[in-house]
């Protein structure tokens, strides 16, 4: 957990403010070399305080991503074909794993996180914290 915290802190220090629409991908790595890239700019929030957060797995998932697909070919959630919802948090956070396809027709996994946590305004800190909670359980 300490490694995750240090890496995410370093990434946040290098980030410009997330108020613009341009994607700001924060990379979080664990001891096994697996990485999650979090888009801190693409965070939506409704009047009810429901946060929608996007991130993408930048390592290969053998059962769903062909070995020929490089992490650099990862794409945003564009064409939705199948999904899996994982209820894993007491704070009603839902993880949705979506398989999408890049321009070459290769399947890639993109992750969406919906949280009913009590954040008034999403910040890079809260975004990374939510992803770290999920990553520590599932990576």
Question: Language-model features: where?
Answer:
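N-terminal secretory-pathway/extracellular module detecting exported/lumenal segments
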Residues: 19-139
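Positively charged n-region of N-terminal signal peptides that target proteins for export
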Residues: 1-4
